[in-house]
């Protein structure tokens, strides 16, 4: 039964990540860096209770080719090989809080919204500490960190960050979203977008 449950988790993760990578792309350019700053509020996930500041900087947006390569790896080899492929990707930017040196973002993609704003998708491999690697709690089966931001034309918005939870699909928009967008553990408030030169 444990093996069956684990297989189900892998299949669910694989399906969700396939949809993340197949988002209808906007122009993915590598111009000026884009910086997003938000106030994070922990909604029940292990870790700091917040609020705290999160900075996300994107220096490189994923190309269609990179997206296609990751999709092919996921479809043909599964989530473990997708994790390896993601880890081998060049740095797309970083995510950090004021008290950390930050973590590299490996995948960054954005698409336009109907109101003139944008939806930003960020993904990276999640740091797994010694205790977690040895004891393999349920969180060990979710090695990805995923961020979704919705930013208006005025550069302000909101978002969610998923560290130990799953992602899902918005079939109407044919895009990946955080599963249960309204109840994900880390809420990103007061998102502000800045362009760095």
Task: State where each predicted segment sits.
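Sec/Tat signal peptide C-region and signal peptidase I cleavage site
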Residues: 23-28
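Long, low-hydrophobicity ectodomains and other hydrophilic envelope-associated domains
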Residues: 29-197
């Amino acid at each position: 039964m444990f093996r069956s449950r684990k297989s189900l988790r892998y299949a669910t993760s694989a399906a969700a990540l396939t949809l993340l990578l197949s988002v209808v792309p906007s122009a993915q350019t590598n111009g000026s860096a884009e910086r997003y700053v938000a106030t994070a509020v922990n909604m029940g996930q292990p870790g700091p209770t917040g609020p705290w500041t999160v900075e996300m900087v994107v220096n490189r947006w994923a190309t269609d080719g990179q997206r296609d390569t990751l999709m092919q790896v996921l479809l043909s080899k599964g989530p473990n090989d997708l994790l390896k492929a993601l880890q081998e990707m060049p740095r797309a930017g970083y995510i950090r809080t004021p008290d950390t040196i930050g973590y590299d973002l490996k995948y960054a993609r954005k698409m336009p919204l109907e109101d003139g704003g944008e939806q930003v998708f960020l993904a990276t491999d999640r740091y797994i500490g010694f205790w977690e690697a040895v004891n393999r709690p349920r969180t060990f089966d979710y090695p990805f960190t995923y961020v979704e931001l919705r930013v208006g034309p005025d550069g302000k918005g909101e978002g969610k960050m998923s560290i130990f939870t799953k992602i899902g699909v918005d079939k109407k928009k044919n895009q990946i979203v955080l599963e249960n967008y309204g109840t994900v553990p880390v809420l990103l408030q007061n998102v502000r977008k800045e362009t760095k030169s």
